[in-house]
Amino acid sequence: MPVENSVDAFNFNALKDAVGIDPFAKQTNKYARDERFYVLQKDKNGNGAALIRFLPDSEKRMIVQMYKINTTITKNDKKRFVNEFSPATIGLPCPFQEKWQDLWNEGKKDEAKNFSRSIRYIANIKILKDPANPENEGKIFLYEMSGAMNSKLEKALNPSETDVSLGKTPKQLFNPLKGNSFRLVAQRGSNNQINYDASEVVAEETSIYQTVEEAIKDIKENTYKLGDLLKPESFKSYDELKKEFLRVTFAEQTAAPTVVQETVAPVTPAPVETPVQTPVTPVQETVAPVASAPAPSANDDLDAILQGLV
């Protein structure tokens, strides 16, 4: 059989239609991983572990909260997805949020779930031990957390009165000189989904730097400014997200839905019934309440570091 016939026998257009992009176009790196973010490597069984330390950034921020679009739609056995941070985080319009709002207002709550946004939490971490990728050790990354993981941190930082009465003490998660490391553990659950339920705070307080000056230098030079994630230019533009909306909804070749043709309007507050859609307090000033820990020496160390970041 001539070679050219073999090539013609493969339908490149069908492949493009199936995945929603031209797999051989230069822009295929649009799905490349953001190397600033740490990803815990898992084995074939879904297990993975690393030892990390949370750090403040050079502007003293500990954690920022962001909305994320995570939409997957299947049509005629073809699956397409979008996984992007939403500009609704900072009050800018987002076509996915608008579509969710329209469907919700029409009473189509199940369909609206396809366009709902999740809440994610971002922090700086330093990798202390990474058995699967030892080359990561000593490096600082951004780490994206779920609400469940963030709650685990909050409970460690600020235990309830009941827990305190039972002997539990606040942990110094963001203190690099006299604080607690965090054991990040991934496992595959009974539902076949990866979870981080086994992750835990290390009880022993340790220092990951020799001096305050060393800590300040590393934080200033190598952490990522969390405030930069909240700048408009850090998000895809409305037009770019509209193109993503049309692609994921298989609407590229048809008239765009009304939701993306309307004049851009402020995002409408979400109904109470869907907590993940509820607007949050502006995240620019979000910091972990480290100072609530009672140990004076630990607080003194952290205060010295934060003063050095001014």
Residue ranges of model-derived segments:
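OB-fold ssDNA-binding interfaces and closely related basic DNA-contact patches used
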Residues: 1-173, 236
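Extended acidic low-complexity intrinsically disordered regions
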Residues: 1-28, 267-268, 272-273, 279-280, ...
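Compositionally biased, intrinsically disordered low-complexity regions enriched in proline and serine
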Residues: 32, 39, 68, 82, ...
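Compact mixed alphabeta submodule
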Residues: 129-263
